[in-house]
């Protein structure tokens, strides 16, 4: 993993640390959080941990305790070995018995009991990717548990998209920011994965990717395809690509969509008008908006980011 030596070191140390046994990784879409979660899972496996992985699903983000059910799914058979109070708590939380939903504290304590039993023979690492999509009830319970892991044999690491607000923002767990790659690391990654890019496309990708590994890996192939869909002339393709006026892959839409969402209303309005016009910074003063640019059928084809 190019440019992630610091983060990898922190995560490797986290596996054996006696303090801060819960950690939240935060970064924008495509910045490499999942790869870092793979790293900490591998490090934990090599050090003798049992690793349980889960991932938030946006479609289930409105279902109370759905996320917690996924996190604990492989451990649920052991609920039968808990005391009756905790068995009832789990039963009502997961719809196996009637009753009022348990409080965060009641369910959190039951989860701690279950995790304590599960980690009696060997230490346990819980890895949750896309934690921003956990339902609110599960986020509260997992956060409650994460704040009470110190000194035990259980560790928790959660990956979050920094641009999506969630209950994790106030969970009070230690955070490890995952920033964009440095210019040097971005160039190294691009040259390693796309060594045959010509200088102009290389510069274009670096400028638009802004250190985002997903964009660095996927933009070159996309821009190459877009270029071949145009007139076949590099200059013409370059104008289209520089404006990013054609549809980009869905995964990259999340990257650029969140950046656009962070802009002011005025700036977003100017971007929208420029996109609809087909006009950009290269338009000459007094020129007709969109003149000499993409035909209207293409120019006005838009998709939500």
Describe every region a protein language model picked out.
Residues 22-37:
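Walker A/P-loop nucleotide-binding motif
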Residues 42-43, 47, 109-179:
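A conserved switch/coupling segment of P-loop NTPase cores
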Residues 14-20:
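Phosphate-binding P-loop
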Residues 36-123, 133:
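Conserved phosphate-binding/catalytic loops and adjacent sensor/switch elements of nucleotide-binding enzymes
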Residues 77-78, 97-99, 155-157, 162-252, ...:
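Helix-loop-helix "sensor" segment of P-loop NTPases
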Residues 201, 266-270, 277-305:
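Amphipathic alpha-helical scaffolds
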Residues 1-12, 107:
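N-terminal pre-P-loop "Q-motif" helix
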Residues 26, 52-61, 161, 178:
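A short hydrophobic beta-strand->loop->alpha-helix junction that borders the nucleotide-binding pocket
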């Amino acid at each position: 993993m190019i440019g992630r030596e610091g983060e990898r070191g922190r995560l490797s140390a986290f596996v054996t640390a006696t303090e801060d046994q819960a950690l939240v990784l935060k970064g924008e879409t495509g910045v490499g959080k999942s790869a870092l979660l793979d790293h900490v899972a591998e490090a934990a496996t090599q050090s003798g941990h049992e690793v349980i992985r889960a991932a938030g699903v946006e479609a289930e983000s409105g279902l109370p305790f759905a996320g917690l059910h996924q996190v604990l799914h492989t451990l649920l058979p052991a609920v039968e070995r808990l005391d009756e109070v905790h068995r009832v708590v789990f039963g009502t939380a997961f719809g196996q018995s009637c009753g009022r939903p348990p409080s965060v504290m009641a369910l959190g304590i039951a989860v701690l009991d279950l995790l304590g039993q599960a980690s009696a023979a060997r230490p346990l690492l819980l890895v949750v990717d896309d934690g921003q999509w956990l339902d609110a009830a599960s986020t509260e319970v997992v956060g409650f548990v994460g704040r009470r892991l110190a000194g035990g044999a259980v560790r928790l690491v959660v990956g979050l998209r920094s641009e999506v607000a969630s209950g994790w923002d106030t969970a009070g767990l230690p955070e490890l920011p995952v920033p964009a790659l440095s210019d040097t690391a971005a160039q190294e990654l691009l040259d390693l994965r796309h060594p045959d890019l010509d200088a102009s496309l290389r510069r274009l990708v670096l400028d638009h990717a802004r250190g985002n590994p997903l964009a660095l890996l996927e933009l070159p192939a996309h821009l190459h395809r877009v270029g071949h869909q145009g007139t076949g002339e590099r200059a013409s393709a370059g104008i289209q690509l520089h404006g990013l006026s054609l549809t980009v892959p869905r995964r990259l839409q999340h990257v650029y969509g969140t950046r656009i969402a962070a802009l002011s209303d005025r700036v977003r309005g100017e971007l929208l008008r420029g996109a609809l016009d087909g006009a950009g910074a290269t338009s000459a003063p007094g020129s007709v908006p969109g003149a000499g640019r993409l035909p209207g059928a293409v120019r006005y084809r838009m998709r939500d980011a």
